[in-house]
């Protein structure tokens, strides 16, 4: 092992720059095993997608079933809304509303039908098409897999604590010789890079697998470029690469079973796991953690059921066939101005589409346990990450028509675009509806106060309108909250599983509170996503900031700066509707979320309150009630920082000094 002590000895430490850190980085790395990764000519492809190995013979039937169910539910919701709006005729603005409602109901229907299918599958005895069985004996591997941990200005101690836990877990399976671990750093901050190298020095001394550290001088291509650089330098030495994020955690058993599945299915290009969220401490993080654990698997299982060999990639916690990736996933600079041109921002969905175009199958592993990640701790960090993903998905719009893509790959790209485009559609739909309602002749004649409405209630009631409105509300409720309720029913149907959620009462209470909070947060996200799309299309694309993974408080100043415009908008709308009670009543759930944007942001980021909820069993998950061994092992010191080192400004900082994130 290379001697690195001079970097950290107090007597020889000096103020350093990132270039100096890179030049002085003498960590041993393996001999390069180059693998060509040519840039793909995205617009030049002869014919359609190459044929891939299908593991399920009735996939076309499944997709027809899903399509018919989605259309039926979407039409039912749209027809109920039409019956409500069309009483007395349809104005031009109401026609706009009805037009915008169509894609909204179809998207909700797809979400509901996918979850319903997943629920039905999970209520039976499902078998993994890939043959991944957690009850089977541990397989013996015959290939080598590289575990890639890309980092960018992260908390080095936390990253290496997770790596140490994964390394130990792999060793327990007896397969340490089949896995090498690479920390591939794109860190731009010299002091963070020094911290990474200090942690690596200890990790390498203790590791069971071969472990390596590489820092790039230029972070060309961001994460996709980071992985591509590794592939081009060392890819031919490894049959597979298991791609992680800095907050990823996977058991050794899960990694071994993924590698075994790749060995048994040589036509598989990628297998994506479903990471469960762990370590949530704030109210916001714990709510996401609870919701994902409770009902995420019904949607995930349904998605796996109808996507088959044409699934998608989430960018992490997935295993990839290295040769297939190198052959098909060299990403070019996209032509044209931003936001559509330049570096590919959201690479994962495009990479899975290119893999499938090249004849490699892309799968989900819906029944594999042992895959984890963490979530943003507050709504501000969630919105920041969401904006970055939004830009990446908008960039996919012209890529949907790329020649040679499988139609399912195009559908995944469309779903990604719609996940953000639905927010402005909802916004414009609501705006058109409110303007239309405000201009109705009945409201022009008189503005009813609450007392006037109560006194004249009997005369104003139109039972046909109430019936139509009730049906529209019921169908919308089922489409929105049905998957969550199905997830709870699944837990209740499985003996002993409800204990992991704190018991029936606590699970029901958590479900109710989560549904309320999600209903309040939805209008806020509608505003933030709509604004993000407008700014991105206007050319304000933003940079690549490091993620804050441990923020446990948002003060009023920060919350107001980010969300104050939403609260003000809600207050203005509420004041405008005060003398039109029907509008105020109809929009109350949306207005509540807007008005409370600032306090909800502050409350959601509260760590102490989140831990109190945990102590009382609210939002409990099985991984919290009985933490898996790897989750327990990933908590704790993973490195011994030097007594002091120096930042760029020459001031010494110690191990307890907070590391500054680079913008």
UniProtKB/Swiss-Prot annotation:
Pathway given for this chain reads: Glycan metabolism; osmoregulated periplasmic glucan (OPG) biosynthesis
Cellular component GO terms held in the UniProt record: plasma membrane
- Family designation: Belongs to the glycosyltransferase 2 family. OpgH subfamily.
Entry function: Involved in the biosynthesis of osmoregulated periplasmic glucans (OPGs).
Give the UniProt keywords, A-Z. Cell inner membrane, Cell membrane, Glycosyltransferase, Membrane, Transferase, Transmembrane, Transmembrane helix
Q: Does the keyword Transmembrane helix apply?
A: yes
Name the InterPro entries for this protein. Glucans_biosynth_gluTrFase_H, Glyco_trans_2-like, Glycosyltr_2/OpgH_subfam, Nucleotide-diphossugar_trans
Q: Where is the signal peptide?
A: none
Please state what class of enzyme this protein is: transferase
Q: Does the keyword Plastid apply?
A: no
A single Gene Ontology MF term assigned here is: hexosyltransferase activity
Name the EC number(s).
2.4.1.-
List the subcellular locations: Cell inner membrane
Q: Could you give a single Gene Ontology term from the biological process aspect?
A: glucan biosynthetic process
> What parts of the sequence cross the membrane?
65-85, 104-124, 415-435, 472-492, 507-527, 559-579, 583-603
One Pfam match, given by its short name, reads: Glyco_trans_2_3
Q: Which SUPFAM superfamilies match?
A: Nucleotide-diphospho-sugar transferases (SSF53448)
- Membrane topology term: Multi-pass membrane protein
- Record protein name field: Glucans biosynthesis glucosyltransferase H
Give the originating organism.
Answer: Caulobacter vibrioides (strain NA1000 / CB15N)
């Amino acid at each position: 092992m290379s001697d690195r002590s001079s970097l950290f000895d107090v007597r020889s430490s000096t103020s350093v720059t990132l270039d100096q850190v890179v030049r002085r980085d003498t960590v041993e790395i393996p001999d390069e095993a180059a693998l060509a990764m040519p840039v793909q000519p995205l617009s030049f492809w002869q014919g359609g997608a190459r044929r891939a190995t299908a593991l399920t013979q009735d996939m076309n039937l499944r997709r027809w079933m899903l399509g018919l169910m989605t259309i039926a539910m979407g039409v039912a919701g749209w027809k109920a809304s039409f019956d409500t709006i069309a009483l007395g005729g349809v104005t031009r603005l109401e026609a706009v509303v009805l037009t915008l409602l169509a894609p909204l109901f179809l998207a909700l229907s797809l979400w509901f039908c996918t979850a319903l299918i997943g629920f039905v599958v999970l209520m039976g005895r499902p078998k993994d098409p890939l043959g991944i069985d957690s009850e089977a004996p541990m397989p013996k591997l015959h290939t080598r897999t590289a575990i890639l941990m890309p980092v960018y200005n992260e908390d080095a101690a936390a990253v290496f604590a997770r790596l140490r836990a994964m390394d130990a877990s792999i060793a327990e399976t007896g397969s340490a010789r089949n896995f090498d671990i690479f920390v591939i750093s794109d860190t731009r901050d010299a002091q963070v890079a020094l911290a990474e190298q200090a942690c690596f020095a200890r990790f390498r001394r203790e590791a069971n697998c071969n472990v390596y550290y590489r820092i790039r001088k230029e972070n060309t291509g961001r994460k996709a470029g980071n992985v591509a650089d590794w592939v081009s330098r060392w890819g031919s030495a490894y049959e597979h690469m298991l791609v992680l994020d800095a907050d990823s955690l996977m058991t050794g058993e899960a990694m071994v079973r993924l590698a075994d599945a790749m060995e048994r299915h040589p036509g598989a290009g990628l297998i994506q796991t479903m990471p469960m969220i762990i370590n949530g401490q704030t109210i916001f993080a714990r709510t996401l953690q609870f919701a994902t654990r409770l009902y995420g698997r019904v949607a995930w299982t349904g998605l796996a059921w109808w996507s088959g060999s044409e699934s998608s990639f989430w960018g992490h916690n997935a295993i990839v066939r290295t040769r297939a990736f190198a052959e098909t996933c060299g990403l070019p600079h996209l032509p044209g101005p931003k936001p559509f041109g330049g570096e590919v921002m959201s690479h994962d969905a495009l990479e899975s589409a290119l893999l499938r175009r090249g004849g490699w199958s892309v799968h989900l592993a819906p029944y594999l346990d042992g895959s984890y990640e963490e979530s943003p701790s507050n709504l501000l960090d969630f919105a920041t990450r969401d904006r970055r993903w939004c830009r990446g998905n908008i960039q996919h719009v012209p890529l949907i028509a790329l020649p040679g893509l499988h139609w399912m790959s195009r559908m995944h790209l469309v779903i990604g675009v719609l996940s953000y485009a639905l927010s402005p559609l909802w916004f414009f739909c609501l705006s058109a509806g409110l303007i239309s309602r405000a201009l109705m002749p009945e409201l022009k004649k008189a503005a009813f106060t609450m007392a006037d409405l109560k006194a004249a209630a009997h005369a104003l009631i139109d039972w046909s309108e109430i019936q139509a409105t009730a049906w529209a509300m019921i169908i919308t409720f089922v489409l929105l909250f049905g998957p969550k309720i199905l997830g709870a029913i699944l837990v209740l149907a499985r003996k002993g599983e409800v204990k992991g959620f704190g018991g029936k009462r606590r699970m029901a209470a958590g479900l109710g509170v989560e549904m309320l909070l999600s209903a309040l947060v939805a209008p806020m996200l509608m505003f933030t996503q709509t604004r993000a799309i407008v700014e991105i299309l206007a050319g304000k694309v933003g940079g690549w900031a490091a993620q804050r993974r441990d923020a446990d408080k948002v003060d009023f100043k920060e919350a107001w700066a980010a969300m104050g415009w939403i609260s003000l908008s809600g207050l203005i709308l509420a004041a405008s509707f005060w003398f039109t009670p029907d509008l105020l009543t109809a929009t109350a759930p949306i207005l509540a979320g807007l008005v409370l944007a600032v306090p909800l942001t502050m409350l959601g980021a509260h760590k102490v309150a989140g831990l109190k909820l945990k102590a009382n069993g609210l939002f409990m998950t099985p991984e919290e009630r009985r933490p898996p061994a790897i989750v327990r092992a990933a908590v704790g010191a993973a490195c011994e920082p030097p007594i002091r080192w120096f930042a760029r400004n020459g001031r010494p900082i110690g191990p307890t000094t907070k590391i500054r994130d680079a913008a």
